[in-house]
């Protein structure tokens, strides 16, 4: 291997190792991968339950149980999490909300929400701005590390609760 190639490989590997992963658990911070493939928009959102409920253990009080049940109910409609332009004429196809807490499983200190959603959009070209209304209801949620992928375009951004929108 030439010296230049070895040096390039070493730099690439050091940069790769220095970049934090999207899977890290940090209170108040979540991650979102958005993918537009033709007329189908899919998303995968991960957020610490502490940022959504104020706790990340199995509920200990009636109020905590009610809060967790209300979150589960709210997540049945993806518009609780993400707001799409009306002009895109999107129809929700699927949502899936998973957490050890929802299943009554005692975690090992940290608990996350893993949320997947899918829309079919009649006018996907109108998907020019996304809002994140969940920030209003969950003040412990501070930011989302977002990755956007569509045909011929990729973008990464940080969406903050102070400016809860993203334009690809």
Regions found by a protein language model. Give the residues of each.
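Sec/Tat signal peptide C-region and signal peptidase I cleavage site
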Residues: 19-23
């Amino acid at each position: 291997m030439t010296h230049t190639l070895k040096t390039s490989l070493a730099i690439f590997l050091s940069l790769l190792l220095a970049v934090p992963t999207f899977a890290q658990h940090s209170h108040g911070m979540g991650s979102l991968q958005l993918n537009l493939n033709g007329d189908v928009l899919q998303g995968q959102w991960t957020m610490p339950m502490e940022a959504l409920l104020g706790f990340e253990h199995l509920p200990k009080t009636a109020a905590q149980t009610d809060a967790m049940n209300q979150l589960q109910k709210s997540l049945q409609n993806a518009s609780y999490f993400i707001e799409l332009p009306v002009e895109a004429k999107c129809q929700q196809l699927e949502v899936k909300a998973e957490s050890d807490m929802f299943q009554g499983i005692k975690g090992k200190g940290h608990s996350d929400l893993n949320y997947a959603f899918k829309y079919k959009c009649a006018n996907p070209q109108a998907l020019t701005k996304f809002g994140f209304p969940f920030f209003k209801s969950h003040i412990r949620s501070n930011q989302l590390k977002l990755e956007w992928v569509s045909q011929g375009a990729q973008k990464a951004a940080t969406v903050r609760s102070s400016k809860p929108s993203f334009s690809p």
